[in-house]
Amino acid sequence: MRLYRDNAVVLRQHKLGEADRIVTLLTRQHGLVRAVAKGVRRTKSKFGARLEPFAHIDVQLYPGRNLDIVTQVQTVDAFATDIVDDYSRYTTACAILETAERLAGEERAPAPQLHRLTVGALRAVAEHNRPCELILDAFLLRAMGFAGWAPALDDCARCSAPGPHRAFHVAAGGAVCVHCRPPGAATPSPGVLDLMDALIRGDWASTEDVPESLRGQASGLVAAHLQWHLERQLRTLPLIERARPHAAVRVEDSVRQDGDRDSTTRTSSPA
């Protein structure tokens, strides 16, 4: 089998034996790839540091039966340099990598849009020109769009009645009209769904003056919507809530509920 090259983001790694590591890569053309990096834990390894999480690399691989083998690595962007020493940036970037891996699908299924989105999100976190929670929420919303899970933010998610609508229900698919509104639907403050829509569209100018309270509500709805579809919580989201306690207010505390609260309109508490 022939060697192949691809552009990749290192999602995670773990030890294999005394000197090797298994790395999980999100590649542009081959989707998720798991590969062995031989000897990278040795002091004299020629590319060990280039295979750390958050790295954006150009990699050459040899196809294997179960795991490919890394043969060459060149750094494209060393995002970790500007991420790992800042807790907020680090936890945000970890959530981006975890989400990318969960949404990439089966191994070797091409995911060029998700790859490009992940690289862009890591670059934005490293440059730190915008609040980390907005970068993360924009990434999550767009990534869910690629997976077919984008929440309805204007027209009713159930009957398509023209919006805007005030109620939001995760299990229903997003914004719902007064006729389709199920028990337990949340009523976000005015401007929250507009913020989420601006993040999906990349309209950053519209996000600049949004109060932290509205950003916190939007973050809660985005996280709840993602976790509903994933069917289990991302490990990194509670860490992000601790990193920004004022902005990442839990949904049940920041969004007024009509009727009994239910698990479809809240995020899980940090452990």
Curated annotation (Swiss-Prot):
GO process annotations (BP): DNA recombination; double-strand break repair
Gene3D superfamilies hit by this protein: Nucleic acid-binding proteins (2.40.50.140), Recombination protein O, C-terminal domain (1.20.1440.120)
InterPro entries: ARFGAP/RecO, DNA_rep/recomb_RecO_N, NA-bd_OB-fold, RecO, RecO_C
Keywords carried by this UniProt record: DNA damage, DNA recombination, DNA repair
Single GO cellular component term: bacterial nucleoid
Chain intervals for the UniProt region annotation (Disordered): 249-271
Transmembrane segments: none
Domain of life: Bacteria
Biased composition regions of type Basic and acidic residues, renumbered to the chain: 249-264
Pfam families according to UniProt: RecO_C, RecO_N
Function statement: Involved in DNA repair and RecF pathway recombination.
Family classification: Belongs to the RecO family.
The protein's name in its UniProt record: DNA repair protein RecO
